[in-house]
């Protein structure tokens, strides 16, 4: 029997994030593979055709870990494929590329002034974006870090001090970006039903983060938020419609 070596782990392939197309004819998913040079993973989009029962590869640049279907049954994902766009990405701008399931070259369609870490198509054809927001971006120094809250570090995340996960509603047609909560509220776990967004969040600033986030209901049509469970009042598990 051949021994397992370090390079053996570079051959693993991880399937994730499967979703049906809006017309129900295909399933798109991501396959990620370890990459020694970047000490990370390369991720590409694949399609399973329910009618033909075939699998095809859609992207090959290794930058499609985060993606979403569009209402027109195409695929979009944040990436930066030119030197100028990569430089803007370092400064906190995300660019969305669109590609047809039938193949072809992905084209840059839109951009948002935020670091997007997740995207989902909403029933009203807008998108729910997960954004990594740095409240100290303009004052953060390269030579040292300021720690004024706990926790200030996360496994696989690095320094997290003053950084928050935020939800925003994005209209790609108009470019309008509407945040669900303020910049110091850390959002996590969501569920969508019709025009309602159910999510958990914990508002905190330069203090100790609690372990009991609140549960909120956001109306996608009116932009109104209703508190269902106040923060620190009780411990909750996974919530869903």
Residue ranges and their predicted role:
Residues 98-137, 169:
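Internal hydrophobic scaffold segments of catalytic domains
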């Amino acid at each position: 029997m051949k021994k397992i070596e370090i390079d053996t782990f570079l051959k693993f392939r991880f399937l994730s994030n499967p979703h049906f197309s809006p017309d129900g004819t295909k399933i798109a998913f991501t396959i990620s593979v370890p990459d020694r040079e970047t000490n990370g993973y390369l991720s590409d989009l694949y399609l399973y055709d329910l009618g033909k029962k075939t699998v095809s590869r859609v992207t090959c640049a290794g930058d499609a870990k985060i993606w979403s279907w569009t209402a027109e049954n195409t695929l979009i994902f944040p990436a930066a494929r030119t030197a100028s766009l990569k430089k803007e990405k370092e400064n906190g701008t995300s660019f969305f590329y669109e590609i047809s399931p039938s193949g072809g070259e992905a084209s840059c369609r839109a951009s948002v002034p935020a670091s997007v870490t997740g995207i989902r198509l909403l029933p009203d054809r807008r998108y729910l974006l997960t954004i990594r927001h740095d409240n100290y971006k303009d004052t953060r120094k390269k030579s040292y870090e300021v720690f004024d809250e706990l926790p200030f570090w996360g496994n696989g995340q690095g320094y997290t001090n003053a950084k928050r996960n935020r939800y925003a509603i994005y209209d790609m047609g108009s470019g309008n970006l509407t945040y669900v909560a303020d910049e110091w509220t850390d959002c996590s776990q969501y569920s969508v039903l019709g025009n309602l967004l159910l999510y958990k969040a914990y508002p905190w600033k330069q203090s100790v983060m609690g372990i009991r986030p609140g549960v909120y209901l956001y109306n996608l049509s009116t932009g109104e938020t209703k508190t269902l469970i106040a923060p620190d009042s009780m411990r909750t598990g996974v919530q869903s419609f």
